[in-house]
Design a protein with these regions (language model features):
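Active-site microenvironments that recognize anionic phosphate/pyrophosphate groups
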Residues: 1-166, 172-244, 252, 266, ...
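Extended C-terminal subregions enriched in glycine
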Residues: 256-275, 279
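A contiguous, surface-exposed recognition patch within enzymatic or periplasmic domains that forms
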Residues: 244-253, 257-262
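Acidic/histidine-rich, metal-coordinating catalytic segments
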Residues: 280-284
Length: 348
């Protein structure tokens, strides 16, 4: 009897994520199983450019009763229901190692990407996305003077818990380093001390050589389905050279970031011809007074959809109790995304 030869597209295996020192279980054969579970509701109704009932549109009143200005570019305001507060006092320290508290000071802000209620990121022009990037950079410069971590992110779509359909993102600044970022900080620092080079700079060079997980590439940036991806069509957006923060981008790199963000978001929408839900955000060197040479700027895109516009991946059971698990391989996901048009399906 001949021995079975391992095939990554057929056989279960584990992949290591050096960025957070964790493993993911890959089970490609499970993609063939029938699905009779929950399906998401499609919401493809035509949205107006201005919704009089939307509390993020220009000139409308927000939930607090305060009116929005008649803004024409990206607009930032303090989150009306902030998760973090500026003047939070420090809790009393406990001697009991099982019951510890830490101080959590910070600020939460909202950024409306444009005044147009109907235009998500892929439907904006590259020039309009450039304006969003400029605001991100300005917010980082301001908040980075007061807080060691500033998290820029977007939850797109009801499937990701987005409470308002007007295209917007969030900016949370805090006095502490969050768990995910701390894991990345430790892993990148350890790699730098051991190898004398930057983990994600080495990684991006190898991905550019291999090409099999590249989704879209521009002059200064590349988006890949990372080798260790957890979510079905997860991507990692990376500059091709060492850059620690968004605020350190050259003008050419910033312009090119707008281009690749539009291309990547368009491919996502084109996959199932729907407004593709995801959570995305940037990770970069903290503002903690250290040189942070081990850090590399990058953005994570975590989309939940798996088989169609209505069937999503659920992180439950084994994923919550054991370790993350995915069905299709990173290479299969990249191949599907790479083959998609960079022209949005609504604009063909």
């Amino acid at each position: 009897m001949s021995e079975t030869v391992f095939e990554p597209t057929d056989h279960p295996h584990r992949r290591y994520n050096p960025l957070i020192d964790q493993w993911v279980l890959v089970s490609p054969h499970r993609a063939k199983r029938p699905w009779q579970g929950q399906q998401e509701k499609l919401s493809e109704e035509q949205k107006p450019s201005h919704d009089p009932n939307c509390y993020l549109c220009p000139r409308n009143k927000r939930i607090t009763g305060e009116p929005n200005p008649d803004y024409h570019k990206p607009y930032v305001f303090k989150n009306d229901f902030s998760a973090l507060l500026e003047n939070t006092p420090a809790p009393e320290q406990s001697d009991d190692p099982l019951f510890q508290m830490g101080q959590a000071r910070g600020e939460s802000r909202v950024i409306c990407f444009s005044p147009d209620h109907s235009k998500t990121l892929p439907l904006l022009t590259a020039l309009e996305i450039e304006e969003v990037i400029k605001v991100w950079q300005a917010q980082l410069r301001e908040l980075g003077q007061k807080y060691q971590w500033v998290q820029i992110f977007e939850n797109k779509g009801a499937a990701m818990g987005c409470s308002n359909p007007h295209p917007h993102g969030q900016i949370w600044a805090n006095s502490f380093l969050p768990n995910e970022v701390s894991r990345e900080d430790v892993a990148q620092r350890n790699y730098y001390e051991k190898h004398g080079s930057v983990l994600l700079v080495d990684y991006v060079q190898k991905e550019l050589e291999k090409k099999e997980r590249i989704v879209v590439e521009t002059e200064h940036w590349v988006a890949v389905v990372p080798y260790w991806a957890v979510w079905p069509f997860e991507t990692l957006l990376l500059p091709k050279v060492h850059v620690k923060r968004l605020t350190e981008l050259t003008e050419a790199q910033a312009k090119d970031l707008a281009v690749i963000l539009k291309k990547l978001a368009t491919k996502y929408d084109n996959l199932f011809e729907t407004s593709f839900p995801y959570s995305m955000g940037f990770h970069a060197a903290p503002f903690n007074g250290e040189d942070n040479e081990h850090w590399q700027l990058h953005a994570h895109f975590y989309p939940p959809l798996l088989r169609s516009a209505t069937v999503r991946k659920f992180m439950v059971g084994y994923e919550m109790l054991g370790e993350s698990q995915r069905d299709l391989t990173a290479e299969q996901a990249a191949e599907r995304l790479r083959a998609l048009s960079e022209v949005h399906y609504k604009e063909r």
